[in-house]
Amino acid sequence: MSVSIFGSAKANSATKALLLGSGELGKEVAIELQRFGIEVIAADSYENAPAMQVAHSSHVVSMLDGEKLATIIRAEKPDFIIPEVEAIATDTLLALEAEGFNVVPTARAAKLTMDREGIRRLAAETLGIKTSPYIFADSKEEYLSAIEKIGKPCVIKPVMSSSGKGQSIVKSAADLDNAWTYSQVGGRSGEGRIIIEGFVPFDYEITLLTVNAVDGTHFCDPIGHRQENGDYRESWQPQAMSTVALQKAQNIAKKIVTELGGYGLFGMEFFVKGDQVYFSEVSPRPHDTGLVTLVSQDASEFALHVRAILGFPIGRIIQYGPCASSVILGNGLSDDIKFTNLDQALGSVAGAQIRLFAKPDINGQRRLGVAIARGETVEEAVDNAKTVSNKVNIIY
């Protein structure tokens, strides 16, 4: 479904977008939608989620409750349904799409990428794309058998999780029990199916933001990132890589987004070893490592996603040179989070920016914001971003 006439928010003819998931990435998407006068409805499983704070209205609902989701969607009648998390009742989205609702980029893309199994089988088994070796397991017995076949070291992940939750590396027999237990408590849907991946020696990881739009497929410059406990801590753009490796990554990305279909931005993750490229994962939405694009490009990943969704051309994406993001990571227990020393943080690096996500609470580790900075080199940009993020004090 395409929209050619755009109404104004809250008017009788308003063009509406419903966000399914309202975290920090959804918040930036909501802001970009509002730049075009779109009425934004934000939904998530908890109150006062970041995107709800900048939306016109909101709903608190489990994304896995298909019946309640369908009730909200039929009542709101959005022009665009925009999934912003993996764990959604995708069968409901498929049914609603068949009724004529517009799921971004497609309901099939949401279903295939809601867990690691659908997209891994599509990439490796249907499209013949190079990935790490893998086996899926439903029980501890299957898990142990899979490790015998895959070998050590290997990576254990719930099929449905994000930000490193439930993920660990098995290096020896001493890690087996803890890795299994963690995989069963860390996933978005609790106990269940996991993937055991053979460890791929790599030089670096990249995110290749890929935009499928009315004027074709477009690529942002590759983004490098550092992970800790399966979650990103810093990202930078551009990541240096060989012409051969970049072309391989772009070819794979185009193959996958073409298969998934629809308009929008896709966060493609790859491992790179020399000129060899291994597909890892894809999300049909903005990627957390892409927060760096808030300063590194003329149009951020969020702006690109919205422009593609609305059916607008992308044209040329302009990259401004070495830029980096550094996570402001909280670790505590509070439902009244406060920040200090922001003046010192912003004053420590010329041109630096801070985004605080305004998450309503914290219990353990949680990403609460990000610092973004430029530099003469990527290394300097990363150092600058870390300098800023490290100066932010969090009060729990």
Curated annotation (Swiss-Prot):
<dbReference type="GO" id="GO:0006189">
    <property type="term" value="P:'de novo' IMP biosynthetic process"/>
</dbReference>
<dbReference type="Pfam" id="PF02222">
    <property type="entry name" value="ATP-grasp"/>
</dbReference>
<dbReference type="InterPro" id="IPR016185">
    <property type="entry name" value="PreATP-grasp_dom_sf"/>
</dbReference>
<dbReference type="InterPro" id="IPR048740">
    <property type="entry name" value="PurT_C"/>
</dbReference>
<dbReference type="InterPro" id="IPR054350">
    <property type="entry name" value="PurT/PurK_preATP-grasp"/>
</dbReference>
<dbReference type="GO" id="GO:0043815">
    <property type="term" value="F:phosphoribosylglycinamide formyltransferase 2 activity"/>
</dbReference>
<feature type="binding site">
    <location>
        <begin position="24"/>
        <end position="25"/>
    </location>
    <ligand>
        <name>N(1)-(5-phospho-beta-D-ribosyl)glycinamide</name>
    </ligand>
</feature>
<feature type="domain" description="ATP-grasp">
    <location>
        <begin position="121"/>
        <end position="310"/>
    </location>
</feature>
<dbReference type="Pfam" id="PF22660">
    <property type="entry name" value="RS_preATP-grasp-like"/>
</dbReference>
<dbReference type="InterPro" id="IPR003135">
    <property type="entry name" value="ATP-grasp_carboxylate-amine"/>
</dbReference>
<protein>
    <recommendedName>
        <fullName>Formate-dependent phosphoribosylglycinamide formyltransferase</fullName>
        <ecNumber>6.3.1.21</ecNumber>
    </recommendedName>
</protein>
<feature type="binding site">
    <location>
        <begin position="162"/>
        <end position="167"/>
    </location>
    <ligand>
        <name>ATP</name>
    </ligand>
</feature>
<dbReference type="Pfam" id="PF21244">
    <property type="entry name" value="PurT_C"/>
</dbReference>
<dbReference type="InterPro" id="IPR011761">
    <property type="entry name" value="ATP-grasp"/>
</dbReference>
<feature type="binding site">
    <location>
        <position position="116"/>
    </location>
    <ligand>
        <name>ATP</name>
    </ligand>
</feature>
<dbReference type="InterPro" id="IPR013815">
    <property type="entry name" value="ATP_grasp_subdomain_1"/>
</dbReference>
<keyword id="KW-0547">Nucleotide-binding</keyword>
<dbReference type="InterPro" id="IPR011054">
    <property type="entry name" value="Rudment_hybrid_motif"/>
</dbReference>
<keyword id="KW-0436">Ligase</keyword>
<feature type="binding site">
    <location>
        <begin position="366"/>
        <end position="367"/>
    </location>
    <ligand>
        <name>N(1)-(5-phospho-beta-D-ribosyl)glycinamide</name>
    </ligand>
</feature>
<keyword id="KW-0067">ATP-binding</keyword>
<dbReference type="GO" id="GO:0004644">
    <property type="term" value="F:phosphoribosylglycinamide formyltransferase activity"/>
</dbReference>
<feature type="binding site">
    <location>
        <position position="157"/>
    </location>
    <ligand>
        <name>ATP</name>
    </ligand>
</feature>
<comment type="subunit">
    <text>Homodimer.</text>
</comment>
<comment type="pathway">
    <text>Purine metabolism; IMP biosynthesis via de novo pathway; N(2)-formyl-N(1)-(5-phospho-D-ribosyl)glycinamide from N(1)-(5-phospho-D-ribosyl)glycinamide (formate route): step 1/1.</text>
</comment>
<feature type="binding site">
    <location>
        <position position="205"/>
    </location>
    <ligand>
        <name>ATP</name>
    </ligand>
</feature>
<keyword id="KW-0658">Purine biosynthesis</keyword>
<dbReference type="InterPro" id="IPR005862">
    <property type="entry name" value="PurT"/>
</dbReference>
<feature type="binding site">
    <location>
        <position position="281"/>
    </location>
    <ligand>
        <name>Mg(2+)</name>
    </ligand>
</feature>
<dbReference type="GO" id="GO:0005829">
    <property type="term" value="C:cytosol"/>
</dbReference>
<feature type="binding site">
    <location>
        <begin position="197"/>
        <end position="200"/>
    </location>
    <ligand>
        <name>ATP</name>
    </ligand>
</feature>
<feature type="binding site">
    <location>
        <position position="359"/>
    </location>
    <ligand>
        <name>N(1)-(5-phospho-beta-D-ribosyl)glycinamide</name>
    </ligand>
</feature>
<keyword id="KW-0460">Magnesium</keyword>
<dbReference type="GO" id="GO:0000287">
    <property type="term" value="F:magnesium ion binding"/>
</dbReference>
<feature type="binding site">
    <location>
        <position position="269"/>
    </location>
    <ligand>
        <name>Mg(2+)</name>
    </ligand>
</feature>
<feature type="binding site">
    <location>
        <position position="84"/>
    </location>
    <ligand>
        <name>N(1)-(5-phospho-beta-D-ribosyl)glycinamide</name>
    </ligand>
</feature>
<comment type="function">
    <text>Involved in the de novo purine biosynthesis. Catalyzes the transfer of formate to 5-phospho-ribosyl-glycinamide (GAR), producing 5-phospho-ribosyl-N-formylglycinamide (FGAR). Formate is provided by PurU via hydrolysis of 10-formyl-tetrahydrofolate.</text>
</comment>
<keyword id="KW-0479">Metal-binding</keyword>
<dbReference type="GO" id="GO:0005524">
    <property type="term" value="F:ATP binding"/>
</dbReference>
<feature type="binding site">
    <location>
        <position position="288"/>
    </location>
    <ligand>
        <name>N(1)-(5-phospho-beta-D-ribosyl)glycinamide</name>
    </ligand>
</feature>
<comment type="similarity">
    <text>Belongs to the PurK/PurT family.</text>
</comment>
